[in-house]
Amino acid sequence: MPPSPPSSAAADQWNIDYVNEDSPLSPRSFSLPPESPQLSTASPIHQRVSRKRQRATSQGLTYNVIRWPLLFFIFFIIYLEFSAYVITRQIVNVFEWLVAWRGYKAKLRKELRKAKTYDEWVNTAKKLDKHLGFDDWKDVEEDSYFDWALVRRVRRTLTRLRAANDTRGLMDALAVCVRANFAGTESVKMYSETFIGTKKAVEAHIKEVAACLDYVRTATDVSLEEKRAFFRAVNKHYGSSALCLSGGASFGYYHFGVIKAFLEADLLPRVITGTSAGGLCAALLCTRTDSELKELLVPELADKITACSDPFTVWFKRFRQTGARFDTIDWARRSMWFTRGSLTFKEAYTKTGRALNISVVPSDRHSPTILLNHLTAPNCLIWSAILASAAVPGILNPVVLMAKDRSGNIKPHNLGGSRFKDGSLREDIPLGSLHTQFNCNFSIVSQTNPHIHLFFFAPRGSVGRPVAHRKGKGWRGGFILSALESYIKLDLSKHFKVIRDLDLMPQILQSDWSGVFLQRFSGDLTLTPRSTIGDWFHILSDPDRPQMKRMLRVGERVAWPALGMVRNRMTVERAILRGRSEVRTALSHDRTSNDPATSLPETNPELTGALDHVPIESDVDAGFVSRSRRARNKTGSKGGDTPEEQLNLAGVFQLDESSKGVRRRKQKKSGMPLVAEPLGELPEVSPTHSPIATESPQRNYTSNFGDSFRHVRAPSLPALSSPFRSIRSNTSSSSNNVQSPSSSQRFRSQLSITRWFGGVSESSSDEEDEDLGGLQSGEATASSGEEGIPTFQLDSAVESHSDRSEDEMLHSGANVKEEYQSEESEGKIPIPGGERVTQEKIDASMASGERLRPAGGSKGSAKTPPVQDGA
């Protein structure tokens, strides 16, 4: 059946080249004329650059004498071990062909490799599982690769709570079990025992978790604030998924097949990263919607890949003149079709909702790798990042990153005009940066680097590719061959580490190549498309339509076995995203959806598959939000999670800027005097007792989340200081009436230390201690007093007065009165507590069974100035 003709929209995608030489955004406009001999910031990607050779630092006579013989000796050992490794791998292949894959299972395996559609592949994989007895392994719940007892207990608990309509109980249970690789359910080993699927107990657990998340999303007995805090917490714990596309020159075009397989299964993650050739594929993915990608991922895509079309005579002459095989300006113009012209990272994220990440390395040897995305470089042009990521020494010269300013003009991304080159030299897969910026806890790596592809060997099987013999429990080629393969590979890594640590490798083309083999090239799930020997002869050539068709098919087939694992992961991840998206929308419109099957809202109906732009959870986003909240608090605007709003004390305390250089808090009301109360009337403090009353019952989840850690207190701290009281009483008798010059500073220090360990609020920060208006620290319970002012009952066993020395407590009344008058003259509002409290009075109060507490509005209480922190 002939393919249907492309639509008009699809035809426009093929015909538009997004290049306008007269436009100020054109790469040609940034280059100097050919006769110009030098580089400037106005022409940052021009290639005619003459560099001065840097003088090498002398390492000593011994280093210079031994360096080269040692380097040649290590490379000779590497050559011998590499030859042994290749021979070992070939012996394993012959063993599997002669012993493991024989008879009917060999026939099924051949059908599996020739499958043209995913449905055909699934049917063949099910036949293989049934023939090899892997279905029995799926039915058995017990297994040593995951905590099956915990998974069964959690699943039963979730089912019972959901049937009982206990929403808050579900939220507490989900907060524990919604974690990345909970109880080993996401382990690669759980998906390496069969050709398709995993244990039925694991799949039932994942379905129950997703159903419970949808139940919490549509529940009506829980406030929106509780839902928002819950989904934010579980999203932080579970994390997000990322698709990482490696480099590999023309081998990187296998990524298009991997992308097509995930696209047709609707399992594309929102975070995409690419390096070198993978950056070109990632740019095409993140600048098109799903419907547009389905029209482009066809063999005709090879017509748009023309970067290596120059004949030998042209590029050889260019290499002698510039030191690079390809022209930067020409590559920039050809790559603009993949990036939709001069799109920036922020514009691409706004259009498709996918976070594009491209890894580049500064030309400086000691500068760290940089991950460019809509957070770190929002205005950077994607085509300049692709050129920098593909700038392999000898292939393409280092490039200056370009960016758009506020007026839409193009300028260098950094003021210094630093140049960047291929990120594969140091960090081909930037997993650390992805976890830090996007909270990515699950990585899907498509690895096509030709120098690394050979070393990927799974001795116990990989996802969707179990070991054929011993019902999946054996070793590939037997234990001896698998052990020999691992030993040789680890020994090769050891030799490369010696070369790197001893700095034996010289710089080739002004680049350090010592760490090329020492990076991490794998992820939680690693896909390695099967290349051919012919690919090595076309490593720097453009593919034609037949080659692109084969690459698309090979990339799809290598991704099909992993779709089951990715689908289970995305089931929970998207259930969390649905909850965050709908709660965010409901907070804006004060409504929620009652349909559990409600799909994610889309900002543009034409963006099929594009998610609502709920911010991807990241520490960078949190930093921006925290900074903006602090700015709003300084300007006095409302909003934000300030300590006053969290404790419902925003109307009680306000900033006092009267003190010089110190931010203080003061009360708006006249305050609460100290009165005595028998100890027997105080409520008993239990380990689960919340020290601060929340605003409403709806905020119980946000306030009590993590009670086991917030209510840890040290009620016996003052008792530890009792041995020192006698010493202080003996030594202070001669200085009872003498005021030390630094007594106020000592009192401030001692009071701060005491309040740090026995703080009133949930946090131990100094800012929240100041929020309590100078009240002495200790275990406190909040209750509503007169005019909405909360009163605090203090535990006398932790009162900070007991930590003060007697020479600071036994001041004369005249000195105290003068101090309070000076405080009033500075404009501070006095609060109760001015009566002088000595150590003898505290001991007498404790002996009589009474304690001191502040009580707002008590009759007959003297309203005297307070003992303020630092007074």
UniProtKB/Swiss-Prot annotation:
One Pfam family per UniProt: Patatin
Transmembrane segments: 68-88
Main location as per UniProt: membrane
Record PANTHER family: NEUROPATHY TARGET ESTERASE/SWISS CHEESE D.MELANOGASTER, TRIACYLGLYCEROL LIPASE PTL2
Catalytic residue list: S276 (nucleophile), D422 (proton acceptor)
Segments of skewed composition (Basic and acidic residues): 798-820
Membrane found in the keyword field: yes
Domain PNPLA: 243-435
Broad EC category: hydrolase
Locations listed in the record: Membrane
Protein name: Patatin-like phospholipase domain-containing protein CNBE2340
Signal sequence, renumbered to the chain: none
Known EC number: 3.1.1.-
Membrane is among the record's keywords: yes
GO cellular component entries: membrane
Compositional bias segments (type: Polar residues): 594-606, 687-706
Record's function text: Probable lipid hydrolase.
Membrane topology type: Single-pass membrane protein
Keywords recorded for this protein, A-Z: Hydrolase, Lipid degradation, Lipid metabolism, Membrane, Transmembrane, Transmembrane helix
Domain of life: Eukaryota
Gene Ontology terms, MF aspect: triacylglycerol lipase activity
Positions of the UniProt region annotated as Disordered: 20-53, 586-707, 720-748, 760-871
Sequence ranges of Low complexity compositional bias: 23-33, 721-748
Family: Belongs to the PLPL family.
